[in-house]
Amino acid sequence: MTGTQAQSSDNAQQPDGLIIAAETRRMIWNAVAVDGDRVFVAGPRWAGVNGPAIALIDGKDGLIPYPDASWNAWQPGSDVTKTFVNVNAIRRDDHNGLWVIDTGSPTFGGDPLPGAAKAVRIDLATNRIGRIYPLGPRVALPGSYVDDIRFHGDHAYLTDAGRAGLIVLDLRSGEARRVLDGAPSVTAPTGRPIVMDGEIVRMPDGSPLRVNSDPLEVSPDGRYLYFGSLHGPWSRIETRLLDDPGISASELASNVEAWADLPPVGGTAMAPDGTLYFTDLANEALKKRAPDGTITTVVQYPGLHWVDAPALAGGFIWLPVPQLDRLPLFHKGTSKVVWPIRLYRYKLDAQAN
């Protein structure tokens, strides 16, 4: 990895402490996970690059497919149960595991291939697949885009950014079920567009890009799951209610509470003290929301253009910058990506260690 000070293509003055940890021309990474001195990155197939789906960073710009080459070698006709079709998120748990969220669809907005949507846990001690959790057709629906994951006890919670809803996964039994399907709390609202470089991000048909249930965090005490569409606002619900399959859909919906009115965010990370770090897309900034609701800017810089899912590790916050809005999909087939793709890290206060 490199450790150089950040410098933007528009020659903006780089903030003190913002370090380029790695850069590449082979991947458009939107996710990062850190295990000691090992740094993993991942990116979606629909971004249109030929690098691995998940990689271990080796040196300044080397990328080693992880956990091996075969899992990163999906092609049409491949066994979708033993390859990564489209990785949208990676997440390190508290038990030496690296979780991989595979949407199962090689195209943006497409339906998951049969049997392809899954959550995969890799044992970081052995670098081998520990367990595969299939997300079957009753969970990953046509149009689903299983987005991200968080944990509490024997359960995991996932967001579906395509077919608005949450997924509750029993880590012991492997059973998964959908909750809050189509509820307002998980549905992208109108009137809160994603704005980058002063313009609304639009789909090829000209309609504004709308991303349903996307970011989520579990409170440090495990009591609440915080969640929302990418556009905001955020809601919360008690995890004990989500964990109970006997709770009715109407009772769950009635227990959703408003939590925080945040702008469109690329990604979030929650510190042990309850501080929520989030990337403010429109302002190319990393901000934080204190437990009392106060919001302040941590660092702002043009190079932080669409920072996606950050990670807290070793006193740093790691910031992958995929520049998703600059992909050809959103510009009539023309790429606006400014190469190389970068991963930054920024030193935080002690409470984020």
Language model: regions and residue ranges:
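Short loop/turn segments immediately following beta-strands, especially the blade-tip
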Residues: 172-176, 237-248, 348-352
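Conserved beta-strand positions in repeat-built beta-propeller and related beta-rich domains
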Residues: 41-48, 100-104, 111, 158-162, ...
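Beta-propeller domains
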Residues: 40-73, 109-111, 124-125
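Asp-box/WD-like beta-propeller blade repeats and closely related beta-sheet repeat scaffolds
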Residues: 106-155, 159
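Beta-propeller fold detector
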Residues: 63-73, 130-134, 177-192, 244-260, ...
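Blade-loop segments of beta-propeller domains
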Residues: 60-99, 103-107, 112, 131-139
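Beta-strand-rich domains and repeat architectures in extracellular enzymes and scaffolds
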Residues: 19-52
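Beta-rich, blade/repeat-based domains predominating
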Residues: 25-36, 78-97, 101, 138-157, ...
